[in-house]
Amino acid sequence: MTGFLPEPLRMLVTSPALLDFTSDGPLPYALRQKFTGKPPPVTSNLSLASQTVLVTGATSGVGLEAARQLAQLGPRLLILGVRNASKAEQIKSELERDTPNLTVQVAELDLESLLSVDRFVDELSANSIRLDLALLNAGFFAHDDRITDDGYSPLFQVNFLSTAYLTLKLLPLLHTTAPPHPPGTTTPPGPRLVLVTSEAHAWTTFPDVPRPTENRTQPILSVFQDKNTLGSADDQYARAKLLLALFGKELSRRLTAAENDTTVVITTPGFCASNFFPDGMMTRLIQLTSARSVQQGGALHVFAATAPGPEIHGAYLRDGKPTGLSKFAQGPQGQILQERLWGEMEEFFMQRGGSPLGM
């Protein structure tokens, strides 16, 4: 019945949370898009001078716009982690032409491949890159029944697994002393990691979450390896974004406990008029009537990347304001899922040769 509907309308009307009329629900979300989302102003005299900034998924849409806006803040080096390197080279030329003294580096990063993630971080390490800001924006949506070479649904691997794995591999490059900032300017304190989730995380739950004392018959990650348990593309996307938000929350908690000065921010730009969803006349009409501009979405990313204050650490920003994750995520089952997920990701990381996280 709903197969003819374009995205994101299909995602909205097929959501189990359709009749949730709290701010978490899909209908209040749709109504908010045109009336909220104006980002708070950036800090006066904000400068990223002498800083190294990484943006993934920066060849189009909100990611590209965020890269452009961050470039205007004058970082020493802007790294674009992208799947399409040839397109990124054109963007590099444009950014360097429009922004004096900016150096842009293009590095290939395909989140459908864990090996590509390894190579990407190895390249950064080999070049002695120290990151001040990592904006992990890359995402993916398609009605796609493929399984990647790593054995996972592409929707899950790109939107959660590879992004979380990249996060863990980048931590040693972020946990370093930040450079001094120019006199008369303000620089965000300490290194920062921004994880881009989606309000769709609130439109799903996770099946069969056991209590901590119970044995789990199927690991969380394996749910996304079996076509019989994947669910629809809409649900895969929502669950991947739910897991990413929970991962970010647990990471921020553990970094604080370990006295690591890296700030973690979880954010969403909302629905923006980009090419994220498959193109079509109805999709374009929905974008025209309901979507935010990519400039708004990019500005929300920049705010998440630069907003000052200790309260920003571990925050989930919606419409540029700290708010709670979904009721499920904050409830007892969500907390169990968060704890289980961290354990699985820590084991996954070490199985791929990562050092014990010590957090």
From Swiss-Prot:
Task: Tell me its EC number(s), please.
Answer: 1.1.1.-
> What InterPro entries does the record tag this protein with?
NAD(P)-bd_dom_sf, SDR_fam
Q: Which GO terms describe its molecular function?
A: oxidoreductase activity
Pfam families, sorted: adh_short (PF00106)
- The record places the active site at Y237 (proton donor), K241 (lowers pka of active site tyr)
Keyword annotations from UniProtKB, A to Z = NADP, Oxidoreductase
Enzyme kind, highest EC tier: oxidoreductase
Highest taxon listed in the record's lineage: Eukaryota
User: Could you confirm whether the keyword Metal-binding appears in this record?
Assistant: no
* Gene3D superfamilies named among the record's database cross-references: NAD(P)-binding Rossmann-like Domain
Binding of NADP(+) occurs at K87, D110, N137, Y237, K241
The cross-references to PANTHER family, in alphabetical order and at most eight, read: DEHYDROGENASE_REDUCTASE FAMILY PROTEIN, PUTATIVE (AFU_ORTHOLOGUE AFUA_3G08550)-RELATED (PTHR24320:SF252), RETINOL DEHYDROGENASE (PTHR24320)
Which family does the record assign? Belongs to the short-chain dehydrogenases/reductases (SDR) family.
Q: What is this protein called?
A: Short chain dehydrogenase resG
Recorded source organism is Aspergillus sclerotiorum
